[in-house]
Curated annotation (Swiss-Prot):
The active site is at D87, E149. Binds 2 Zn(2+) or Co(2+) ions per subunit. Pathway: Amino-acid biosynthesis; L-arginine biosynthesis; L-ornithine from N(2)-acetyl-L-ornithine (linear): step 1/1. The keyword Zinc applies. This is Acetylornithine deacetylase. Gene3D superfamilies: 3.30.70.360, Zn peptidases. Belongs to the peptidase M20A family. ArgE subfamily.
Length: 389
């Protein structure tokens, strides 16, 4: 028997009031268990079958998979997957003028941490499906709530690697202002570490200056940057080639001492189609002259787990379906989402309420003008992909 859910705004309020920050810093990182349990209770009240999945190698993080419209054995074919992440970024208390964990309505906007990015999306889903009749679904509806999108994307990675589900289509409800997104660049971030040999600067030959070796390495990487710009091109992107950025460098401790260690932090944002393995090979090849000349003194280490580029082809029939429903052409963006991993399960678009411009900002908000169009859109998606009788 179905239980009655709270009104939409109260669902939203409860989600925002349940902290679920993910951060590389363990002092800031929080479990999302309370939020997952909250969602699990609500979806169970609506008659969904609910599965909570611990995510390995995390600090007590969980995914949730809720499903309805499957057969008695919990099986189904095709259907729709609506996905989103349960975590938020940390907040800067000094820059917020409101309590981040209290939903505040002002000037037709809802303020709070996660209102746009993107805990609020689950309130939209729950509100849209509260009256769903499972007996009228000919294909299943799945809801996926993941962990740690803002850091390692561990939840989406784990789900994609272990699920047997194969829905017809997935929507990730990141804030796109309800414009469908079909592609984005990937992201890799590496530390280039040089180990030299310290010594007195009066006799440079008695040491190995790590800064000199880093200079050689950066020269090689800049040549690779040019190669990437010349070899890879996608005119759909505002910046139509892979980018490489040198973001942080540190080395040495005194002007009169040969530098023993130097470290560079850099990132590359590859286009869809440029695989992570290809990119690693290009990096290794670019730095090989330095490695050969100075054996054992150069290393490349990941700063964060890499994210591949993502693309759903423009001619995929699902793209046409969504464009027709919305009357909007699909777009490409420069930020990253869980789409490369969900795309391993089924064709995927990124589409949700709110603006990316409010994500990761003090006084994060979502414009209430998105409420009715989003509710209507989710209903249309369920009708189309789950084929209500």
């Amino acid at each position: 028997m179905k239980m009655k859910l709270p009104p939409f705004i109260e669902l939203y309020r409860a989600l925002i009031a349940t902290p679920s920050i993910s951060a590389a810093d363990s002092a800031l990182d929080q479990s999302n268990e309370a939020l997952i349990n909250l969602l699990a209770g609500w979806f169970a009240d609506l008659g969904f079958r609910v599965e909570i999945q611990p995510v390995p190698d995390t600090r007590h993080k969980f995914n949730l998979l809720a499903s309805i419209g499957e057969n008695e054995n919990g099986e189904g074919h095709g259907g729709l997957l609506l996905a989103g992440h349960t975590d938020t970024v940390p907040y800067d208390e000094g820059r917020w003028t409101r309590d981040p964990f209290t939903l505040t309505e002002h000037d037709h906007k809802l303020y709070g941490l996660g209102t746009a990015d993107m805990k609020g999306f689950f309130a939209f889903i729950l509100d849209a499906v509260r009256d769903i009749d499972a007996s009228k679904l000919t294909k299943p509806l799945y809801i996926l709530a993941t962990a740690d999108e803002e850091t390692t994307m561990a939840g989406a990675r784990y789900f994609a690697a272990n699920t047997q589900l194969r829905p017809d289509f997935a929507i990730i409800g990141e804030p796109t202002s309800l414009q469908p997104v079909r592609a984005h660049k990937g992201h890799i971030s590496n530390a280039i570490r040089i180990t030299g040999q310290s010594g007195h600067s009066s006799d440079p030959a008695r040491g190995v200056n790590a800064i000199d070796l880093m200079h050689e390495s950066i020269t090689q990487l800049m040549a690779l940057r040019t190669t990437l710009q010349e070899r890879y091109h996608n005119p759909a992107f505002t910046i139509p080639y892979p980018t490489m950025n040198f973001g942080h460098i540190n080395g040495g401790d005194a002007a009169n001492r040969i530098c023993a260690c130097c470290e560079l932090h850099m990132d590359i944002r590859p286009l869809p189609g440029l695989t992570l393995s290809d990119l690693n090979e290009l990096m290794t090849e670019a730095l090989e002259p330095v490695s050969q000349r100075w054996p054992g003194r150069l290393s490349i280490d990941e700063l964060h787990p890499p994210i591949p580029g993502y693309e759903c082809p423009t001619d995929h029939h699902m793209v046409g379906v969504i464009e027709k429903l919305l009357g909007e052409r699909t777009a490409v963006v420069n930020y990253c989402t869980e789409a490369p991993f969900i795309q391993q399960v089924c064709p995927t678009l990124v589409l949700g309420p709110g603006s990316i411009n409010q994500a990761h900002q003090p006084d994060e908000f979502i414009d209430m003008a998105f409420i009715e169009p989003t509710r209507e859109l989710i209903g249309q998606l369920v009708d189309h992909f789950c084929q209500q009788k």
